[in-house]
Amino acid sequence: MAYPFQLGLQDATSPIMEELMNFHDHTLMIVFLISSLVLYIISLMLTTKLTHTSTMDAQEVETIWTILPAVILILIALPSLRILYMMDEINNPVLTVKTMGHQWYWSYEYTDYEDLCFDSYMIPTSDLKPGELRLLEVDNRVVLPMELPIRMLISSEDVLHSWAVPSLGLKTDAIPGRLNQATVTSNRPGLFYGQCSEICGSNHSFMPIVLEMVPLKHFENWSASMI
């Protein structure tokens, strides 16, 4: 989860988030190099009145600064496309969970079980226990097995919502009348927090998401107790 005054991204919990963080560093390095070069050239232009006459009308220089940006854009686009295709892949999910957005709560249905469904509301600040997080805790957490591919089917009953868990690299729009899907895979157990990321009304800020990733054995025990 995020902390106050945090400068970097949240710790990656899924393979997709690890790829996104690597892509972020890759792109940031390119931006830093370009910015440094531009600032260096500007500083030279401001500190000297001399001009190279050979660069006033140089075909070679114009060719270089036309081709070089194209190469840089390709170096950014190819890793980006690779990650986009990875995010769309869903390989043999062991579990499917249907997520519906409402004003202003989430409902979940484990489609592999007959009667395993519940609503998830934010816990009011006045009802929080010591150590719980304000505006992020819910009365019913989404319990999922770790280290296994899980398919999330996401839609909405009323207006546009967005189901987002940053540490897992997830952000999928919940659109009325349309069913979007995403893959959830966690490398480690724990609680992972998210929120609705699409302005959906007056209580938009009060639609938290809490995923509880547990070992498969614990998930089986939990699902048996819920049915």
From Swiss-Prot:
Native organism: Apodemus sylvaticus (European woodmouse)
A GO MF label: copper ion binding
SUPFAM superfamilies in UniProt: Cupredoxins (SSF49503), Cytochrome c oxidase subunit II-like, transmembrane region (SSF81464)
Its job: Component of the cytochrome c oxidase, the last enzyme in the mitochondrial electron transport chain which drives oxidative phosphorylation. The respiratory chain contains 3 multisubunit complexes succinate dehydrogenase (complex II, CII), ubiquinol-cytochrome c oxidoreductase (cytochrome b-c1 complex, complex III, CIII) and cytochrome c oxidase (complex IV, CIV), that cooperate to transfer electrons derived from NADH and succinate to molecular oxygen, creating an electrochemical gradient over the inner membrane that drives transmembrane transport and the ATP synthase.
NCBIfam families to which the protein is assigned, alphabetical: CoxB
GO biological process: ATP synthesis coupled electron transport
Membrane topology term: Multi-pass membrane protein
InterPro entries associated with the record: CcO_II (IPR045187), CcO_II-like_C (IPR002429), CcO_II_C (IPR034210), Copper_CuA (IPR001505), Cupredoxin (IPR008972), Cyt_c_oxidase_su2 (IPR014222), Cyt_c_oxidase_su2_TM_dom (IPR011759), Cyt_c_oxidase_su2_TM_sf (IPR036257)
PROSITE patterns xrefs: COX2 (PS00078), COX2_CUA (PS50857), COX2_TM (PS50999)
Enzyme Commission number: 7.1.1.9
Residues annotated to bind Cu cation A1: H161, C196, C200, M207
Residue ranges, Mitochondrial matrix side: 46-59
Keywords per UniProt: Copper, Electron transport, Magnesium, Membrane, Metal-binding, Mitochondrion, Mitochondrion inner membrane, Respiratory chain, Translocase, Transmembrane, Transmembrane helix, Transport
Protein name: Cytochrome c oxidase subunit 2
Transmembrane segments: 15-45, 60-87
Binding site for Cu cation A2: C196, E198, C200, H204
One GO CC term on file: respiratory chain complex IV
Binding site for Mg(2+): E198
Top EC group: translocase
